[in-house]
């Protein structure tokens, strides 16, 4: 049996972390430039 709730939460957290990481990286890149 697959834990769909855990899988959904994990995917949501990973997607949010990736989106937040990209925005954070862009803000740093803009400060350097």
From Swiss-Prot:
Please give the start and end residues of each transmembrane region.
5-25
Q: How does it sit in the membrane?
A: Single-pass membrane protein
Give the location in the cell: Virion; Host membrane
Q: Which superkingdom does the taxonomy of this entry point to? A: Viruses
Write out the GO cellular component annotations.
host cell membrane; membrane; virion component
**Has keyword Transferase?**
no
Which keywords does this chain's UniProt record carry? Host membrane, Membrane, Transmembrane, Transmembrane helix, Virion
Membrane keyword on record: yes
Disulfide-bonded cysteines:
none
Family note: Belongs to the inovirus G9P protein family.
The protein's job, in short, is: May initiate with G7P the virion concomitant assembly-budding process, by interacting with the packaging signal of the viral genome. The assembly-budding takes place at the host inner membrane. In turn, G7P and G9P are present at the end of the filamentous virion that emerges first from the bacterial host.
Instruction: Return the protein name.
Output: Tail virion protein G9P
- Source organism per entry reads Enterobacteria phage I2-2
Query: What does UniProt list as this organism's lineage?
Result: Viruses, Monodnaviria, Loebvirae, Hofneiviricota, Faserviricetes
């Amino acid at each position: 049996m697959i834990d769909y709730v855990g899988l959904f939460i994990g995917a949501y957290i990973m997607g949010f972390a990736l989106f937040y990481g990209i925005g954070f990286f862009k803000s740093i890149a803009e400060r350097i430039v």
